[in-house]
Amino acid sequence: MRINPVQAILASVVILGAAGLSEALRPRELMAATQRAPNLESVIPKQFGQWHLVPNIGLVTPSEPEAYLQRDLENRIYSQEVARGYADAAGNVVMFLVAYGPVQNYRLKSHLPEVCYGAAGFRVSSKKVAELTYQPGAPPISVSRVIAQKERRFEPITYWLKVGHDVANGVFDRQMVRMKYGLQGIIPDGALIRVSTVGLSEAESYKLQDQFIHDLLEALSPKDRRFFTG
């Protein structure tokens, strides 16, 4: 087949232009480099309201596959992780985890509880979404709820994911938020916030977890609270 030289030149221009546009739109600026996350270990209180710290609680933590490990800290999935247990005045224990990563692009993404619990041998089911009100007049936090079970351990979980300044729990939502930041040339940071309980019914667990989240957010300064709520 004979190729028209003019068409070949035009096709080359289009291909080169598309490649150049793709490179120009590639996110380059780390949000974490310009908007530092708080030191979670210090800003999250060890005692607040009716809650006090319970040591040596065995939490299921997000895994970090060896394939993702890099020498550069900015390329690690999580650069901060706080895992604690808290008990209220009645002795009810809540397990609390926050994992923060400075790079939340398509290659390095937050590990959902479904993933890390599944890797630990749990069966995860009964997923649902809920709106959590933590302050009058403030937009509610969209959270996900699942139940993890392993042998006799029954663990209802409430969690949410932040990508940049947005709460985005669904796969499509996270893709859209990352695209929004990508069009601005920004690589967003992100965080996983998780609360769970063992030894209570599903309804009792979620009620206790909601109370814990409400009390924790109320104990934080407005600036630190925004890290959790977006």
Language model regions located:
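Amphipathic alpha-helical segments
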Residues: 42-61
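Short, solvent-exposed recognition patches
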Residues: 55-181
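Alpha-helical transmembrane signal-anchor/signal-peptide segments
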Residues: 26-45
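A generic secondary-structure signal marking the coil-to-beta-strand transition
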Residues: 49, 92, 189-191
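Generic detector of ordered secondary-structure context
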Residues: 43-44, 78, 185, 208
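A short, solvent-exposed beta-edge/loop patch
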Residues: 4-23, 30, 130-230
